[in-house]
């Protein structure tokens, strides 16, 4: 699989992320034929295989997904819930994080969950106290039942900021059609054959998504925002994409493009150095190009960096 990815030009400059390494949903049926010890061994082998094989290509991983509900998940029997009940959540989390870290010591490792309540925060606290090295906290925000609003988003940010770890909003969706009924507890239970995007819904989606992105971008610990469906209908048939089913762009596509590539973009600027050859710039974090006559030099503005020496 590595050979299929590493030479693709489309991947240049794009950070790839693996999702997920351990999850109780969509597990192999044959795990049920194994003992708990064998299930755990198979899970750790799987982690070593994937993380080692894609090292240098995929260096960000959701190590374990939705562990808050994992030991009490009862929709159907599965091997991962079995070993989570046996070991307990924190012990299982520690084992899968250690296996991932061993396979790729330089990878960024996340815990990820849809549960944004205090239960998730308590689990994270327990993991950190047990010595689990979590690099970033993954927060899902599937808003099929309506936009959270700024107040709820800020409450979630406040709850998980207490750990002073980077926050990754890993799974973001806002629909551009009818809102899913509020009484649905598990989003996966809402299965419809037709869930169209509407003109009114598309305008609402664009406005709410811009507000959501701006709220997250303004927080100093938010490091990543991942939109879950680029094209409508890709998960639960929901109209949650930036593109319609025919791949035509919706208003949200143009609004986020404007936000990221215009409002949150620095330059171009023409600058003149002082007598010492220095110049001061203020800009958004990221990669820049310095053009001086016939030379082009790339450099980065990273969090905490104040000086960059460039030789031309």
Where are these regions (language model features)?
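Short, acidic/polar
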Residues: 1-2, 39-51, 117-127, 206-215
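Substrate-binding cleft and catalytic face of glycoside hydrolase catalytic domains
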Residues: 2-108, 114
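Histidine-centered active-site/metal-ligand motif
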Residues: 19-20, 66, 142-144, 219
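Aromatic-rich peripheral "rim/lid" segments of glycoside hydrolase catalytic domains that contact
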Residues: 53, 62, 67-90, 95, ...
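Aromatic- and acid-rich polysaccharide-binding/catalytic face
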Residues: 58, 65, 99-114, 120, ...
